[in-house]
Regions:
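Alpha-helical segments flanking ligand/cofactor-binding loops in enzyme cores
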Residues: 80, 140, 159-160
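Alpha-helical substrate-recognition element adjacent to the catalytic core
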Residues: 2-115, 119-120
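A short acidic, often aromatic-flanked loop/helix-cap motif at beta-alpha or helix-coil junctions
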Residues: 117-121, 190-197
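Short acidic-hydrophobic, aromatic-tinged amphipathic segments that line or gate anion-handling sites
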Residues: 112, 184-193
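An extended, acidic
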Residues: 96, 163-165, 176, 198-208
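Substrate-recognition "cap/lid" segment bordering the active-site pocket of phosphatases
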Residues: 97-149, 180
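Short alpha-helical
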Residues: 97-98, 134, 157, 176, ...
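Acidic, Mg2+-coordinating phosphoryl-transfer loop and its flanking beta/alpha structural elements
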Residues: 88-93, 147-188
Length: 208
C-alpha cells in the first residue's frame, strides 16, 4: 500500500532566506544572492565563502543573525496541521549549523541538509554536500519505498525535486522561475499550498 509524504524546501517556504538576512545585517549586499539568482549551487557557495573570508565573518556572526530570525508567520501552524495527515520531510540546501535554532521554533520537523567545515577560529572554510542532487535523490528513494510524494519549493534548486515527485508545487516563486517552469501550480499562502497538496494527493491514481 502506498503512503503519502510531503517534501518541502526550508528557506523561502518555511523560513526567511538566511543569506539575505545576513546580507542585510552585515551590510554586504553580495551575500543576498540565492539560488533564485544563481542556480549553480557550487558557484554560489564558493562566492559566499569568499565574501565571508574577505569580511572576516565567522559562524558565530551568522548564528547571531539566525537566532534573531524566526520562521515565516504561520509556518509552524501549517507544518503542525500538515503532519497530522501526511509524513513531512524538509529537504534543504542549508546547513545543520544554520538550521538548528529555526528547527526548534518549528517543533523539530525532520530535516535533511548539508554541513559546514569550521576552523578553530570559527571561520567557515568549506561546505560538504550530503550528496549531489540530494533533494531529487531523496524523493527518488521515497518513491522506491512505495511513497507517493508531493514536493513544494520556491526556487531553481527545488525544481529537480519537484520534477522527480509525483506532483510539484511552487510557493512564492520569483517570476523567472514561474516563466521557466510553467508546468507547476503556483501558490502564495500556506492555505493555498495546503489546498494544492491535498488536491495533488486526491489525484493519486493519476499521478502515482
Amino acid at each position: 500500500m502506498k503512503q503519502s509524504i510531503v517534501t518541502l524546501d526550508m528557506e523561502g517556504v518555511l523560513t526567511p532566506e538566511i543569506w539575505i538576512a545576513v546580507a542585510e545585517k552585515t551590510g554586504i549586499p553580495e551575500l543576498s544572492r540565492t539560488t533564485r539568482d544563481e542556480p549553480n549551487y557550487d558557484k554560489l557557495m564558493k562566492s559566499r565563502l569568499k565574501l565571508l573570508a574577505e569580511n572576516k565573518l565567522g559562524l558565530p556572526d551568522i548564528q547571531k543573525v539566525i537566532c534573531a530570525m524566526g520562521p515565516v508567520p504561520g509556518a509552524r501552524e501549517f507544518l503542525d496541521r500538515l503532519r497530522e495527515d501526511y509524513e513531512v520531510v524538509i529537504l534543504s540546501d542549508t546547513f545543520y549549523e544554520f538550521a538548528h535554532p529555526l528547527m526548534r521554533q518549528l517543533a523539530w520537523p525532520t530535516l535533511f541538509c548539508h554541513s559546514l567545515e569550521i576552523d578553530a577560529a570559527g571561520m567557515v572554510v568549506n561546505y560538504h554536500l550530503r550528496m549531489p542532487e540530494q533533494k531529487r535523490e531523496a524523493v527518488k528513494r521515497f518513491k522506491e519505498m512505495n511513497f507517493t510524494v508531493v514536493a513544494a519549493g520556491d526556487s531553481y534548486n527545488d525544481t529537480a525535486m519537484l520534477g522527480e515527485a509525483h506532483a510539484g508545487i511552487l510557493f512564492h516563486p520569483p517570476q523567472n522561475v514561474i516563466r521557466e517552469f510553467p508546468q507547476y501550480p503556483v501558490t502564495y499562502s500556506f492555505d493555498e499550498l495546503r489546498a494544492e497538496i491535498d488536491r495533488a494527493f486526491a489525484r493519486v491514481p493519476e499521478i502515482a
